[in-house]
Amino acid sequence: DESELYQKINEPEFRAEFKKHVSEIFTVGLWHRDFSDGWITHCPDESLVGKNFKQVGDEYGVDPVDAYFDLATKYKESLRWMTNYSNARPHIMHKLIASPFTHIGFGDSGAHIRSLAMYNFPLRMLKYVQDAKLKGEAFMTDGQAIHKLTADLADWFGLDAGHIRVGDRADVVIINPNGINDDVDKISEAPMEGFGIDRLVKRNDDAIDATIINGKVAYKKGDYFDADLGKEKGFGSFLENRFVEDREVNKQSDSINKPAFSQFYL
């Protein structure tokens, strides 16, 4: 029950336990737990927008954790805030992106629809490359970036994809370089059908001119999505790993051999 949850965070015992865990540096995980890096983006009290919880706590003479819980109790879902838990050091991030041991994969946004919107990793990487080049600090060429997002991934996972070759299945994304702008970082909200809630999304409307799957135009700027997308077959197919051998049944032992991979790169 929502009311019980808000009542819970006002219990002195709960807050004391919460502060204890926040201060335990050896158990820090994905989030750094530093409320001085928790910045208010939306609040009925507009004077608080742009401030972090430590600043608010200093103004009211309370601990940053208490400032956070007090505001959360008072404004509930009308209070919005953000923090940075990754990619805070560009020079390190550039090295990681350029490393042959790094893949630009997926975000965990699908499991956190109300708090994360990192669906556009590939576009965000292209913006990192573009921004660095404009600053005269290029760490990767455009061609290397596209290769890392396509052929590099396909070759690693043994998929017949990621290359443009005569006779291949036509899976193509047409990107407008001028659309790789600050909008790539903007977060929007959109209704999630069937659940009665809004989820966080990133639009990137100016970045993608068209998406072609298996030779069929799935999306075209201005025309939006094909009416058959997600309803009719033909837009995609199962991509089999070409490194996996066929499973064979050993009739004598009645056992099944496990798939064998040709090689791993570590």
Predicted regions and their residues:
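Hydrophobic, well-ordered secondary-structure elements that form the walls
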Residues: 61, 108, 126, 145, ...
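Hydrophobic alpha-helix feature that most strongly marks membrane-spanning transmembrane helices
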Residues: 73, 101, 127-134, 150-154, ...
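C-terminal cap of metal-dependent C-N hydrolases
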Residues: 95-102, 107, 121, 174-231
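Intein/HINT protein-splicing elements and their conserved insertion hotspots or analogous self-processing inserts
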Residues: 219-266
